[in-house]
């Protein structure tokens, strides 16, 4: 009787383990399928703008509106007071950007009264805006309000989020605004900048791959040396001094 009971117990245990194992396998497969389905369903959202300088001297400006429509315009010459209009991927946080000469920043700056250091925005414009406004670095119109102080961003704007070029444009704009008041904005390269520019897109949102596919180009081409953001990025430092402090990613 005891051996029969033991046999039944072993049988039930084996059956239960097999059932749990099959459930876990099915759950794993189901999770992978859902992830693939999510990637397939991801669509274009508000993005850009991307400014590309053509070999014939024309300027191509690419935007995506919040409905996912690609607006691709080529100019023989840019209109006077040409302005880029930027929003996040949902059409929020609107600000304008005017192109300005790109200069390589210095690597050694004097100590400012205040230095605000941030890192790894990873495509989250909403978080960047909240952080900068909460610390009185920008005002309600997203303009520089940090006076003669120094904003330091230690890399990694690319990947994970859906507002990558928008964050680049914000710092591009603030850099010029800060300089006019005696302040400084320093954006340094992290590890994700060279990764993406080398076409390593492991952590890049699917929407960017979809955009590149629709434009019939590789994604890094939108930040190449013949683009405005690409020219700005290629001048960024990988390490920098402020006073006696060394900053690296």
Predicted features by range, described:
Residues 26-248:
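Feature recognizes metal-dependent phosphohydrolase scaffolds
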Residues 1-30:
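Bacterial Sec-dependent N-terminal signal peptides
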């Amino acid at each position: 009787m005891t051996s029969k009971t033991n046999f039944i117990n072993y049988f039930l245990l084996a059956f239960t383990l097999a059932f749990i194992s099959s459930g876990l396998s099915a759950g794993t497969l189901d999770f992978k399928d859902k992830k693939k389905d999510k990637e397939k369903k991801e669509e274009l959202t508000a993005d850009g703008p991307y400014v590309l300088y053509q070999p014939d001297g024309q300027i191509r400006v690419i935007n995506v509106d919040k409905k996912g429509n690609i607006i691709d315009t080529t100019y023989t010459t840019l209109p006077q007071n040409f302005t880029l209009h930027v929003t996040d991927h949902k059409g929020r946080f609107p600000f304008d950007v005017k192109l300005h000469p790109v200069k390589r920043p210095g690597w050694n700056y004097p100590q400012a009264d205040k230095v605000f250091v941030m890192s790894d925005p990873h495509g989250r414009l909403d978080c960047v805006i909240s952080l900068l406004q909460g610390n009185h670095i920008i005002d309600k119109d997203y303009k520089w309000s940090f006076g003669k102080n120094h904003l330091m961003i230690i890399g990694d704007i690319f990947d994970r989020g859906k507002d990558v070029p928008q964050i680049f444009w914000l710092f591009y704009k603030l850099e010029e605004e800060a300089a006019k008041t005696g302040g400084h904005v320093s954006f340094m390269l992290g590890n994700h900048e060279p990764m993406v520019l080398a076409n390593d897109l492991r952590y890049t949102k699917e929407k960017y791959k979809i955009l590149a596919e629709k434009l019939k180009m590789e994604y890094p081409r939108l930040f190449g040396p013949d683009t405005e953001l690409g020219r700005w990025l290629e001048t960024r430092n990988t390490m920098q001094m402020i006073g006696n402090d060394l900053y690296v990613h």
